[in-house]
């Protein structure tokens, strides 16, 4: 008797100095799960970053990293440890590899017990395949560690790694992850029923066309792997929607063209997305978060979707979010009004900089301050309020060759004109023009991807060519300024007497003036 092919799906933990888990979900992996089910697979999910009902995940100290350096170490004791100004504590957010190994061994023991008493279709078997999603390139180490754990517990299973990291840097993934004789495929070449592919570890780049239009298989969060509900298991209280993929522009720091194999924009049929919203709303989910490369490029389709949501009285109480940002030139008055009516309580606008030269250097030719003001005026006309968290602006800093005065000018402008400022430290992304432009510096420093995390200020030394006395404290002061200005629009206050690095740096600036 032949049995259906089984796959264990794993979303790894992450190693970082900070992590915001509010709308964290392995939506690519969950869409692939829906696709695999159409192929007859039996599935089980382990989301190492599964957030609790307060949208937080556990964290454990892992090591100390020095800013703009490859130096790292573990202190003899964490209890009395205090990092220096140029050091950052790196945490493991989510389920640790050690805890994951215990979980896998439980699955193994249960499967073997069921096998001894004849095959039980209600028990998830030892997996034929293990599918692992890998997101940011600078988080690649946790993917490696998850693979190592899986190898120890399920040595016969073949492994598939997909996501942003293996798409942007497949050679790095092949070289570093410890895969066995891996085959590199584009998503469009993937055939899970091909016997040759079934025998090989795979590195999968780009998207799987057959999975793109499918809904997320959230039911895996409450199933034991064989379609049976787990005791006390619940669906997440939010979900992710993707109604389009791709972007026709090619900003110097952005990888969307590589992730989507070109500039073509794929749009999901709005009726399908609407049915998904209805289904999940009826299951009790109220928050829906759009993750798109450029939300309003498929504007006609998107507007049809949110118009149906706005007009559906059964969806009263829904909350919609677009935290990736909205293209300012496309935020027309009617669009802003419809978004507000449908349930978008907040807008996120990619201001990034008010400096025209920097916009040009970043190849952001499709936006400028006139278009930003256009979007801002339309948002206000639609009922969004300024100088509160209704409208939020992203500000990009920590870039090579940046003009620090322009960053300060942008912060002051955004705070006074808009209100809520969201600081974004720059991380160079492999395969982008900006990464290639500064590749010599990156290689000279000996940086691997984990050292390029923006929170580690990888271009601090580079920018000292322009600002000789530039220090970590200057960036802490800049962050402190943003948090201080944000206190007028947020419920929480900035503790000027506090003990964290940002608060200390800001206090030093005040006492020096």
Question: What name fits each language-model region?
Answer:
Residues 223-386, 397, 412:
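Radical SAM [4Fe-4S] cluster-binding motif and immediate context
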Residues 7, 159, 288, 320, ...:
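Hydrophobic/aromatic residues located in beta-strands of well-ordered beta-sheets
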Residues 165, 293-297, 325, 398, ...:
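Short, solvent-exposed turn/loop segments enriched in Gly/Ser/Thr/Pro and often Arg
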Residues 2-283:
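Acidic, low-complexity intrinsically disordered segments
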Residues 8-15, 24, 390, 404-513:
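C-terminal accessory regions of radical SAM enzymes
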Residues 170-175, 334-335, 400-415:
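Catalytic cores of alpha/beta
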Residues 179, 340-346, 416-420:
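Glycine-enriched alpha-helix->loop->beta-strand junction motifs that scaffold or abut catalytic
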Residues 38-43, 153-154, 282-283, 312, ...:
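A structural motif corresponding to the C-terminal end of an alpha-helix
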